[in-house]
Amino acid sequence: TDYSAIYMNEPVSKKIKDFQTHLQKNGFKLSSSEGAVYIEQDRSFVVKNLSTMMSEPMKAYLLQIQKENREGFSEDAAITIKPKQHVDRIIWYENFIKNNPTFVLLENCKSYKKAYLTYLLQGIDNTPLYSDAEQMTFELYYATSFKYLLKTYPEAETTLLVTPYYEAIKQKQKATINDLIKKYTIKGLIFSLN
């Protein structure tokens, strides 16, 4: 069955509508990415129907994941959220991890934070860090992200990590930049993209 009609604003058959309804009643939904349609968990269903059985940290975590799934992050190897959202996600995880050190999904939270920080520091294929790599000229996305982080969260752990990196880029110190990326990778703060 071809489910692409749902996302192409084409008429949808009764069979597909019924299938969609059945999925929704059971906590799932149809989604699509780069033309492929797939089934995924409907996190709003989980929060709505099971929240009375959850701890406050679990509710907060699931609401955050639901928000991130709704907003997305990247499509076709390009970041699709605004710089402020990107930074706010990193800080949300930083604070959540600090405030919930025994949370059952703590490693998952650390992994999300690590991924978001990795892409903030190194870019992603179709949202590169530099508009001109030779001149080390920031893409506007990252210039905006770093300025927002430094201004809004001056006391955050993430800001302490990012500040020397940001300064090294502004001063075009390639060796320092490479050393910091290596150091952060070894410490497990970011993923290795090489």
Positions of predicted regions on the chain:
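Solvent-exposed, acidic/flexible segments
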Residues: 9-12, 16, 43, 79-86, ...
